[in-house]
Amino acid sequence: LQFIPRKFDDALYIMYSSRTTGKPKCIVHGIGGTLLQHVKELGLHTNLTNHQNIFYFTTCGWMMWNWLVSSLFFGATITLYEGSPATPSLPEFFDIIDREEIDIFGTSPKFLKALEETGYDALNKFKSLKTILSTGAPLISEQYDFVYQKIKEDVQLSSICGGTDILGCFMLGNPVLPVKRGEIQCLGLAMD
C-alpha cells in the first residue's frame, strides 16, 4: 500500500440526504472530522478495541456502512453480510454472531421486532456478544425486554441516534453507565 498525505478537511465521503425535505442534497464529509467523530463514537461510546469483531447489518448506501468501515482504524475485524437476513430465516441469520464470534452487533428495531415475532429464544447463547447497537428508529421499552429476556442478560444494549448530515451520532451508548429500559443513554461527547 502507498499512503498519500491528505489535508484534514479533504473530502472523504459524499453522501446524499434523504428525500424527506425535497430532492436529495449532496453532503461532503471531510477526512479529519469524520475520523475524529467515528473514533470517539466507536472507541469511547461503543468500547471497540483491536481485538473485537463488529458486525453492523447495513447496506453500503446507509451511513452506518461508513461508520462501520471506520472500525478498521482500531484494527478491529468487521464482518459483512450480503443478502436478506430472512433467508433462510432470521434465527439462522442471527447465528452468525456465534459462528463469527461477534463482539458488537448493529441492527435496527425493525429487525429485533421481526426476530421477536419468530418466537426467538436463545438466552445467553452468545458467548462473545458484548454490545448490541440499534438505530434507524427509537427502541421501544418492550424491545429492551426482548433483548434481555430472550437474547442475552448481560449485553450492553445501546439505542443510537444520528444522521447522514453529520455522518455520526447525536446520542448513543456509554459502556460505563447503566442501561435504562426505553432510554438512550447519553448525548455524544461534545454534542451538547
Labelled PLM ranges:
Residues 14, 27-30, 57-58, 63, ...:
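Generic beta-strand/beta-sheet core signal
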Residues 76, 103-106, 116-181:
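Gly/Ser/Thr-rich phosphate-binding loop
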